[in-house]
Amino acid sequence: MNKVVVKNVTFGEGAPKICVPMVGKTVAALKEEAEMLQTIDLDVVEWRVDFFEDVKDLAKVEAALDEIRTILPETPILFTFRSAKEGGELAVSDEFYFELNETLAGTGKIDLVDVELFNEEADVLRLIETAHKNNVKVVMSNHDFDKTPAKEEIVSRLTRMEALGADLPKIAVMPKSAGDVLTLLDATNTVSEKANQPIITMSMAGTGVISRLAGEVFGSAMTFGAAKKASAPGQIDVNELRHVLDLLHKQF
């Protein structure tokens, strides 16, 4: 399997990397969050820009990014506009979604960009090309807040993401039972054994919390923890998360 190196973080080896979302609505709130995150043991910061109140002004988005980067100069930043259809805060046109992501990837000031799988393939490929030209890695994602698809479907989506050029394919699904969590873990194990790229998977809510902890066993390269406000159901406090990941890593 290829390793994916972003600044001082290597995906695809050792314990899953911890990503903590920033969900501030204003520049002031984001600066406060970034300063707090400086004090926390994390690997990646995800800027959930769909929470940012000036997201439609691209100059203001870049200015906010500059403020975050000043406070967190060495921390990998994952730039994510989560669409409303995949559980995000704001509904926007497909045109704006791609304009925003291409513009910010084109600055080279972010380290990773989230690209949702279920969009026009030509748009997705163009965004991946822009990202890679600017040394920005692509987390290609899919989120199902209603259910856990069949194992074959989860495997198919992750495999398709890699085929399209994702550096880190990602899927998050909602369990209705413990069996659904096993389905997600089984799919993760199957894909990670044959994939060229590290993958990121999770089963959400309380039922799925084991999937956020067991990535090193089953093959998920990153997990999401909450420092302030969880951006998805089931995210664990980042300090507790690190403790458990370290414990499992020592035994593995």
Curated annotation (Swiss-Prot):
Tell me the Gene Ontology biological-process terms attached to this UniProt entry: 3,4-dihydroxybenzoate biosynthetic process; amino acid biosynthetic process; aromatic amino acid family biosynthetic process; chorismate biosynthetic process
Listed binding positions for 3-dehydroquinate are E46, W47, R48, R82, R212, S231, Q235
Q: Cite the entry's keywords alphabetically.
A: Amino-acid biosynthesis, Aromatic amino acid biosynthesis, Lyase, Schiff base
Q: Where is the active site?
A: H143, K170
Q: Which InterPro entries does this entry report, sorted A to Z? A: 3-dehydroquinate_DH_AS, Aldolase_TIM, DHquinase_I, Type-I_3-dehydroquinase
> SUPFAM superfamilies, per this entry?
Aldolase
Q: What class of enzyme is it?
A: lyase
Name the EC number(s).
4.2.1.10
What does the record give as its pathway? Answer: Metabolic intermediate biosynthesis; chorismate biosynthesis; chorismate from D-erythrose 4-phosphate and phosphoenolpyruvate: step 3/7
One GO MF annotation is: 3-dehydroquinate dehydratase activity
Catalysed reaction, written as an equation? 3-dehydroquinate = 3-dehydroshikimate + H2O
Entries under HAMAP family matching the protein: AroD
Q: What role does this protein play?
A: Involved in the third step of the chorismate pathway, which leads to the biosynthesis of aromatic amino acids. Catalyzes the cis-dehydration of 3-dehydroquinate (DHQ) and introduces the first double bond of the aromatic ring to yield 3-dehydroshikimate.
The Swiss-Prot or TrEMBL record describes its family as follows:
Belongs to the type-I 3-dehydroquinase family.
What is the protein's quaternary organization?
Homodimer.
Question: What is the name of this protein?
Answer: 3-dehydroquinate dehydratase
Protein's organism: Listeria monocytogenes serotype 4b (strain CLIP80459)
Q: Which gene encodes it?
A: aroD
